[in-house]
Swiss-Prot record:
Compositional bias of kind Basic and acidic residues: 8-27
Record-given protein name: Protein FLX-like 3
GO-annotated cellular components: nucleus
Compositional bias per record (Polar residues), positions renumbered to this chain: 258-275
GO biological process: cell differentiation; flower development
Keywords associated with the record: Coiled coil, Developmental protein, Differentiation, Flowering
Coiled-coil portions: 40-229
Family (UniProt): Belongs to the FLX family.
Record-linked InterPro entries: FLX/FLX-like
Gene3D superfamilies per record: 1.10.287.1490
Region entry Disordered, spans: 1-37, 252-283
Organism: Arabidopsis thaliana (Mouse-ear cress)
Function description: Has no transcriptional activation activity.
Disruption phenotype: No suppression of FRI activity.
Length: 283
């Protein structure tokens, strides 16, 4: 419509443009005067008519163009409405896509956070796995050591089992040794008692020897006094006539027994206390 107004305004301006025309005469009332137009005016009129025709053709062309533009405008308006509808539909689709994209982004972010947590957990698992590998190696070393110890223990067990088979014999030997020990203890006790008795016998023998030595001294003194006297035949001590040894008749009522000096010493050395008691059999 603005194009149409612009075209009519141009036409109106072209009709009112009198720059090429002669100046108008004052308008007179009454019938017009018939005067022949000058030739220049005719030429101008012809020119103006040609210009009018040209402008009319231009106007028609512009009108046809305006109709075409109006049709194009209607088509464009229809297309604009369709485009607006399509745009609205596209906006709805875009909003749906954005919502879906936001949902996917949230899911992706959640998955990313979950994966990051899994990665951190995997790092901790890796550390734990390395620690467990070290512990497994240590346990393998301990296992090897224990296997060696088990072999040694098995050898010791076999040895102990073989030794256990010898235990009954060893027990019998221990019992025999205990019996021998008891016999030895009894023998030691008997030896102690016997030694004590021997000590008592020795003391009594020493006392007897001292008393006998005194008697011998007395006898020697008596002999000395007897030697100073004259010898008689068949004296009181029964000395033989041809025996110069000075033997005496045996004591304790022995008949026809005479003891010399050596026999007397043996007799006094083997007193009654020197006789040993018979030993008892060991249990």
């Amino acid at each position: 419509m603005s194009g149409r107004n612009r075209i009519h305004r141009d036409i109106r301006d072209s009709y009112h443009d009198h720059r090429d025309l002669p100046p108008e005469r004052p308008f007179l009332r009454g019938p017009p005067l018939l005067q022949p137009p000058p030739p220049s005016l005719l030429e101008d009129l012809q020119i103006q008519e040609g210009e009018i025709r040209r402008q009319d053709a231009e106007i028609r062309r512009l009108l046809s163009d305006n109709h075409g533009l109006a049709d194009d405008r209607m088509v464009l308006e229809r297309e604009l409405v369709a485009a607006k509808e399509e745009l609205h539909r596209m906006n709805l689709m875009i909003s749906d896509l954005r919502a879906e994209q936001d949902l996917q982004l949230r899911e992706f972010s959640e998955k990313r956070h979950k994966l990051e947590g899994d990665v951190r957990a995997m790092e901790s698992y890796k550390k734990e796995a390395s620690q467990l590998r070290g512990e497994v190696q240590k346990l393998d070393e301990i296992k090897r050591e224990l296997s060696g110890n088990v072999q040694l223990l098995r050898k010791d067990l076999a040895k102990l089992q073989s030794d256990n088979k010898q235990i009954p014999g060893m027990r019998a030997e221990v019992k025999d040794l205990q019996k021998e020990l008891m016999h030895a203890r009894d023998a030691i006790e008997y030896e102690k008692k016997e030694k004590f008795e021997l000590m008592e016998q020795r003391q009594t023998m020493e006392k007897n020897m001292v008393s006998m030595a005194r008697e011998v001294e007395k006898l020697r003194a008596e002999l000395a006094t007897v030697d100073s006297r004259p010898w008689g035949f068949g004296g009181s001590y029964g000395m033989n006539y041809n025996n110069m040894d000075g033997t005496f008749r045996g004591s304790y009522g022995e008949n026809d027994t005479y003891l010399g000096s050596s026999e007397r010493s043996q007799y006094y050395s083997h007193g009654s206390g020197s006789q040993k008691k018979p030993r008892l059999d060991r249990h």
